Amino acid sequence: PADQRLVDITQECMYKGMALVKPGAQLGDIGHVIQQHAESNYYTVVREYCGHGIGKGFHEEPQVMHYGRPGTGMALKEGMCFTIEPMINQGKPQSKLLGDQWTVITKDRKLSAQWEHTCLVTKDGIEVLTRRKEEVFPWEQ
């Protein structure tokens, strides 16, 4: 059904972004491929939230936007660690933080999905630090 399709496309968006991770790639390349895949499937990308660097602190620079233009943004370097975690909506991209200051919903109350992985840039590309044992990535098939 429509809700499972949203979940599947969101995972595909994340994987498409992850497939670009390697030294020299730019953050705008990752955001662009995610946005392009979401929008080509008639979904929107949440812009108020993004992936983030991970280091001594949990949420650090750089911000990893899930939309953007290719050839823009910070260039990736070996050793960088960050999340790719697109939030993809059935309706409009705007979201709303509820009074508990934690729960986020879409303003139009349509469904949203999110997938997340933590990525380490290696000299050869990517190591996925949050990989599930049974998970096979599209670029490995």
Report each predicted region and the residues it spans.
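Active-site neighborhoods and metal-handling regions in enzymes and metal-associated proteins
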Residues: 1-141
